[in-house]
Structures are given as structure tokens and as C-alpha cells.
Swiss-Prot record:
Gene: metXA
GO cellular component terms given for this protein: cytoplasm
Keyword Transport included in the entry's annotation: no
The name this protein goes by in its record: Homoserine O-acetyltransferase
Pathway: Amino-acid biosynthesis; L-methionine biosynthesis via de novo pathway; O-acetyl-L-homoserine from L-homoserine: step 1/1
Record bears the keyword Cytoplasm: yes
Gene Ontology BP terms: homoserine metabolic process; methionine biosynthetic process
UniProt cross-references to SUPFAM superfamilies, sorted A to Z: alpha/beta-Hydrolases
Annotated substrate binding sites: R227, D351
Main location: cytoplasm
Annotated family: Belongs to the AB hydrolase superfamily. MetX family.
Compartment(s) where it occurs, according to its Swiss-Prot or TrEMBL record: Cytoplasm
Amino acid sequence: MTISKVPTQKLPAEGEVGLVDIGSLTTESGAVIDDVCIAVQRWGELSPTRDNVVMVLHALTGDSHITGPAGPGHPTPGWWDWIAGPGAPIDTNRWCAIATNVLGGCRGSTGPSSLARDGKPWGSRFPLISIRDQVEADIAALAAMGITKVAAVVGGSMGGARALEWIIGHPDQVRAGLLLAVGVRATADQIGTQTTQIAAIKTDPNWQGGDYYETGRAPENGLTIARRFAHLTYRSEVELDTRFANNNQGNEDPATGGRYAVQSYLEHQGDKLLARFDAGSYVVLTETLNSHDVGRGRGGIGTALRGCPVPVVVGGITSDRLYPLRLQQELAEMLPGCTGLQVVDSTYGHDGFLVESEAVGKLIRQTLELADVGSKEDACSQ
């Protein structure tokens, strides 16, 4: 993977979206994406030595707006709103939190809905990308802003996969990591559910082979069905049954064409995503998740993990059925910088890493303590 050199650019003002040009990127598979732009936001001030950056890495349909209200450039409130700020787990009196919109996304960074050099949307021409490509793009964006090393990387789900690739591929550029609700590779169950979601989008007649952007028709039905299916994997069976059981939605009767309460809930989740996300990005990023394998090209998973010197905290959710605890246990046992799996007790399933603020906040603080130790060790070695 290679990235062309670009002039140094500035960090955006706090909470505002900045667009960082990183030039052309050659992907892991050899494809070239020209004129790549990465959307960036930050909270807190960069230290004079530029050594206090905490990268917050979003999951599949997230973006750079981790905290704060909706506003220009970010139509929804922060998706991890409690994580950063004065006195928060990432205390912006001490740390500078930076978040990007991932390569392939649709909230400012280059993705299939972006215009290629010919002035037309990339669409079906947008290449397959890997988690490693996403990390390379993030690192290039930081470098363009004059940042060559971060204190910590923090992420869950796809963000956890990005954090894992960061510490494996660039251990000299990060002092600590927090890996939440993730595994060393995509499992058969994940690939099965995720390829089914992709199929729901691609079988929508409005998909048009991925080149729908200038037609006035988008695969909205396919995207909402994909999201409904995905959302089932994000929550736990216990939580859903406790909330909805087999109840009807209000006065509706399923026997006469009405809906169940859980059906209405899932439709609402699909409609919410439709208002803020692009189907093309959903397909690209889901395919990226399917290809996740930290051992690829590194002599296998064991070799890749056991050779990583970065101190890490690994956390899992008790009720997570998309990334069950056994996957985090494997990570914790094989990473030499991990002292043991941290288990978060939650009924919220995979989404527990977003919801359980107290427990996950403790893990973030533990990670930043490791980063502080790394900072002192760096100072002693100079």
C-alpha cells in the first residue's frame, strides 16, 4: 500500500469537520484511488510535542462526529457522545481526541458516492478496500496534519478491527490500544449475515449495479432491510424479548396485515439509517469487514498477534452475539501486551460497547494510563 505525499494541512477547529487531502492511495489489492479526502474532527488541544492524540475509530455506519449536537456537516448527534470532553473518559483537558470518517464512508471521506477524476461518482468503480487500507488512510491524514504518532487508538466493532490493524501494522506509531467487541478475523457467522445484507441491497432494482447516484433512484428498500437484519445482530435476544415480546404494534393486528412491535422497531432503525447513510458505502464497508483477517500475509494470526509489543486493553460484551466473548478471549490470550480479557456485563448485545458508559469508560481510562506509561518510557529512551 502506498500513498502519495501531500503538503501539511491544519487540524480543524474543535468539533468542526475538516477535510484532509492525502493524495492517491494504492490499496492492499493494488487498486489506485486518486485524490483521497479524509474527513476529520477533533476535541481538545494538541500538545506542543504532539504526543497526546487519542484516535477514536468508528464502526460500520459511524462517522467523525463522536460527540456533540447535530449541526453543519454532521446531521446527527455524536454517536459516542459520553466518550470525550472535560472530565470524560478521554479528558480533553489532557488529551486531544481525533476521529475520522473512514475511507469508503459517506460523511466527507472518499467513498463510492464521491466524484472521481472524470467528474462522475465512483459507484461500481470504487475498489474493494481492506481494514488495512482504512488505517493507512487515517495515518496519512494524521501525517498531513503533522502528527506521526498517537497516544492511543480506541475502537469497537469495525473500529476495533481498525485499532487492531493499527497496533499490528504500525506498532511504532501508537503507545496503547483499546480493542472492543472485535475478533482476529471475520467469522463464518459474520460473513453469512453480512453477505445476506449485501444481497438485500444488490437485489433491489434501484441498485443498478452500484451506479445509481445520478439516476434519481437509490436502493432504499434494500438498505433498510439490510439494516433491519444487521440491527438484530447488534442487540441481544434477551433485550429484544424483554422490550417487545410478541406484542402487537399499538392497535395493529398482524393477523390482518398489522405489525408486531419488534417489526415496527426494526423498520424505524432502517428508516433512520436511510436518512443519513449511503447504500454504496454500506456495501463497500461490509465487504471490508468480511475480508478482515489480521494474519493475512503475516504468517498467520498467531505470528501476527504474538509479535505485537503494544500494550492493549481487550474488552468484550457478555451478550454480544455478533462478536461473542470467545473472540475477545482469543485476542487477549495471544496479544503479549494484554493482561487479560475485560468483560462488560450487559444485556444490550454488541451495542453494549456504545451503551455501557461506566464500564467502557473505565476501560478507556485504563488504556490511557498505559499510554501515559508509554510516554514516560519514550522520554527515558531519548
